[in-house]
A protein has these predicted regions:
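Conserved PLP-binding active-site segment in aminotransferase class I/II-type PLP enzymes
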Residues: 1-81, 85-89, 168
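Active-site phosphate/pyrophosphate- and oxyanion-stabilizing loops and adjacent acidic/basic residues
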Residues: 63, 161, 189
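PLP-dependent aminotransferase-like
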Residues: 89-178, 185
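Conserved active-site segment immediately N-terminal to the catalytic lysine
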Residues: 176, 180-196
């Protein structure tokens, strides 16, 4: 191999530095402390209705998140994995459906599709963003492709314009995984509000 690795003085592939930012401030720490100190982590009362869907702090958080980012609804879940499971189920993935996903992500990107009997298909990444490369997405599409799971990484968004131009005309659903880029905007629109 003639080229040297970047770590050994060779030319780096990536030219844009990763964002290095603090993700939790005083308000978030105070809110979490308030809930923990109340000893009421959920409104669940073992009764029918929406009581299981979190306590008043959870409801307030969901409402403020939806308002802040322009979503019609915001529903909190216990983990990133659970969020992907809900999203993949919501778009109707069935056994044999192909779901294009990132090879550079937590395993839940692929296993959420597998849970519903879907087949994960890995597309290549854009070397600048480490998000899915739209050209590679297009190359991976078959008649069985039903969804694309876009993982926004390192506080930066994927190329959503190109991805939506590929997906929409074909009726392919786009699921945005924003766990590693919360509160990020793409061309003045909150990520998570662009796909399906």
């Amino acid at each position: 191999m003639a080229e040297r690795l970047a770590i050994l003085g060779g030319q780096p592939i990536r030219t844009i530095p990763f964002l290095n930012r603090k993700t939790m401030g005083t308000n978030e720490i105070e809110a979490a402390t308030r809930v923990i100190n109340s000893e009421i982590l959920s409104g669940f009362l073992a009764a029918p209705g929406s009581f299981f869907n979190g306590g008043k702090e959870v409801k307030a958080f969901e409402k403020s998140w939806a308002e802040k980012y322009g979503f019609k609804h915001a529903i909190s879940v216990n983990s990133w994995t659970s969020g992907l499971m809900v999203a993949v189920g919501a778009v109707g993935i069935k056994p044999g459906d192909e779901v294009i996903c990132s090879p550079y992500s937590m395993s839940a990107s692929a296993t959420a599709a597998l849970f519903y009997g879907g087949i994960p298909v890995f597309a290549d990444l854009d070397p600048e963003t480490f998000c899915l490369d739209p050209k590679s997405i297009e190359e991976k599409i078959t008649s069985k492709t039903k969804a694309i799971i876009v993982v926004h990484l390192f506080g930066g968004p994927a190329d959503m314009d190109s991805i939506m131009k590929i997906a929409k005309p074909r009726g392919i659903k786009v699921i945005e995984d924003c766990a590693q880029a919360p509160g990020v905007f793409y061309k003045n629109k909150a990520i998570g509000a662009i796909g399906d």
